[in-house]
Amino acid sequence: MARRTPSQLNMLLAVDKPVGCTSHDVVSQCRRALHERRVGHAGTLDPMASGVMVMGVGQATRLLGMLTLDTKSYVADISFGVETNTDDAEGEAVRTVAVASELRDPAYAREQLAAMLGPQMQVPPAFSAISVNGVRAYKSAREGNAVDLPPRPVEVYAADLIAVSGEGDTCVWTVAFSVSKGTYIRALARDLGRACDSAAHISALRRTASGVVSIGACHAVEELSPEFAAGFALDPIAALGATRVDLPGDLADDLLCGRRIPVERALASFDSSKAPFALVLDGGLKALARIEGGRFVMEHVFPQAIGGVR
């Protein structure tokens, strides 16, 4: 079988991950859809979760660790009455508590959610991808081993009640969260249940934003193709939180060779106090640089320009 010709695509994309597949599945699907082996992502989502996944394609995979995606937003369904070993609906019940009537009171729900705001130390779920002595925690947990993960600093910026639903033995709070990177919404649900003298787990989860990338910028994998993907590209400079600097085309060879370039070669004024600097030639991102001694010093050079610059 003949090999596919590489797509030559170099860009960031936002994909709306569906429920039921892993983050690696999404990477594999994008590789097939775009005919491009070099595809990666900027942060995982659990199989039961859906929503924003930021993908790097081609040269843009080098940007994934630099993106300013520190704030995450989610809409979560928190089901009371049962705590599971995974802190979500896919796990086994480890504790069951009768649903108290106060849990159905929106005022009580808002009071409890308000108490969750701010910086805190969070114990991650035992079923997580955190490595312990070189082994993923979820692998140890699946084998029946005790997993003792140390608490980590996280912050909850917002926890807004959308609705209280359910009747009989069920009670569900639908909550919009805004949290720091590394916060486990599953763990928030677990701790919320305990704070309410109850038990709780996540029954549905959707990531609605990752940094500056919102769900409205996302596309289904089925929409992707080499011919049309360029129209879906994210602005890499906005995603990096970088300062744009346009340079004349005659500096292409200097950039490619990593030579220092005088700041005065910039085609327009820019804020020299806000690094990093995204160097743009002919509408494409060619390098990231800092300034030393009145010259741009290259930190990352992209032989194939990264598209999507606006």
What residue spans do the PLM features occupy?
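Accessory RNA 3′-end/elbow-binding domains used by RNA modification enzymes
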Residues: 1-18, 24-41, 45, 49, ...
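Catalytic cores of RNA-modifying enzymes
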Residues: 1-180, 185, 190-217
